[in-house]
């Protein structure tokens, strides 16, 4: 088989219905990619189910407007795009749209390139607990049986 480095959306992709979570609060968090959305939630777990989240799978605002249409409770949008040139341009463009429509917004910028890199860095710096029991080769074989055909 061939490997491909293509990273993009399928032709049939409908950006207004991309990866998302509908909460009931007045807050919507918009991300570029699903992994960044999930990373952000994993770092901000408190009451996460209450809020709405969407991954545009690019720097489009279509999913944001669909989420606002589906949940009229949304009063504030948090733009959580990547900390790179495309994310900066996207945040500027979308914030101008929101400003023109009179919608409250805030721009949240990850420390590193994106929220997943921030999460990875936070995990790397977290203290790790060592195993408190030895694993012998015999017990490892019992834990991880190998299927031989």
Q: What feature does the model see in each segment?
A:
Residues 1-70:
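Phosphate-handling DNA/RNA-contact segment within nucleic-acid enzymes
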Residues 42-149:
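TOPRIM fold recognition
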């Amino acid at each position: 088989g061939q490997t491909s480095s293509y990273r993009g959306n399928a032709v049939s992709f409908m950006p207004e219905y991309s990866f998302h979570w509908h909460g009931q609060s007045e807050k919507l968090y918009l991300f570029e990619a699903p992994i960044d959305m999930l990373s952000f939630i994993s770092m901000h777990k408190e009451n996460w189910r209450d809020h709405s989240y969407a991954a545009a799978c690019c720097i489009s605002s279509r999913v944001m407007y669909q989420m606002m249409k589906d949940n009229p409770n949304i009063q504030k949008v948090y733009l959580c795009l990547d900390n790179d040139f495309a994310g900066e341009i996207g945040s500027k463009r979308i914030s101008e749209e929101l400003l023109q429509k009179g919608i409250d917004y805030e721009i949240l910028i990850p420390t590193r390139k994106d929220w997943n890199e921030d999460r990875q860095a936070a995990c790397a710096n977290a203290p790790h607990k060592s195993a408190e029991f030895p694993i012998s080769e015999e017990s490892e074989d019992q834990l991880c049986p190998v299927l031989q055909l």
